[in-house]
Amino acid sequence: MVLSAADKTNVKAAWGKVGGNAGEFGAEALERMFLGFPTTKTYFPHFDLSHGSAQVKAHGKKVGDALTLAVGHLDDLPGALSNLSDLHAHKLRVDPVNFKLLSHCLLSTLAVHLPNDFTPAVHASLDKFLSTVSTVLTSKYR
């Protein structure tokens, strides 16, 4: 999916509002995913998945950092996310559907925290962005 110039502007503006909260929002999205889609917990058998756990917060920071990296490389997402794609495809073997589930939870989290900025156009742009990130992360599965 190709991001238009307007999409890129919307994504950068929205992520700019996220600011230093990317890790917190990532952790919140993970918690939402674990609650709403309990089968996703199977990829984290060694984690304490309780609310506010240090392990979920640490992984949320990784998610937030990866998305921040992606926002900074909207014109070369495959290059920017190549190592993460390798990790998830070859080492972790995460089922690709889980990226869609986490994307849904990220959108919900952003809508809660950025209600005035989460317009239909921004929602659509963020959805396209997260879908593109998911596609890149699953590209090495083939």
From Swiss-Prot:
Where does the record locate the signal sequence feature? none
Cite the InterPro entries for this sequence.
Answer: Globin, Globin-like_sf, Globin/Proto, Hemoglobin_a-typ, Hemoglobin_oxygen_transport, Hemoglobin_pi
Chain residues that bind O2: H59
Please give the tissue specificity annotation from the record for this chain.
Answer: Red blood cells.
Fetch the Gene3D superfamilies from UniProt: Globins (1.10.490.10)
Q: Which residues bind heme b?
A: H88
Molecular function terms in GO for this entry? haptoglobin binding; heme binding; iron ion binding; organic acid binding; oxygen binding; oxygen carrier activity; peroxidase activity
Q: Does the keyword Ribosomal protein apply?
A: no
Going by the UniProt record, its keywords in alphabetical order are:
Heme, Iron, Metal-binding, Oxygen transport, Transport
Q: Name one GO biological process term.
A: hydrogen peroxide catabolic process
Keyword Metal-binding among UniProt keywords = yes
Q: How does it assemble?
A: Heterotetramer of two alpha chains and two beta chains.
Q: Which family does it belong to?
A: Belongs to the globin family.
Q: What is this protein called?
A: Hemoglobin subunit alpha-2
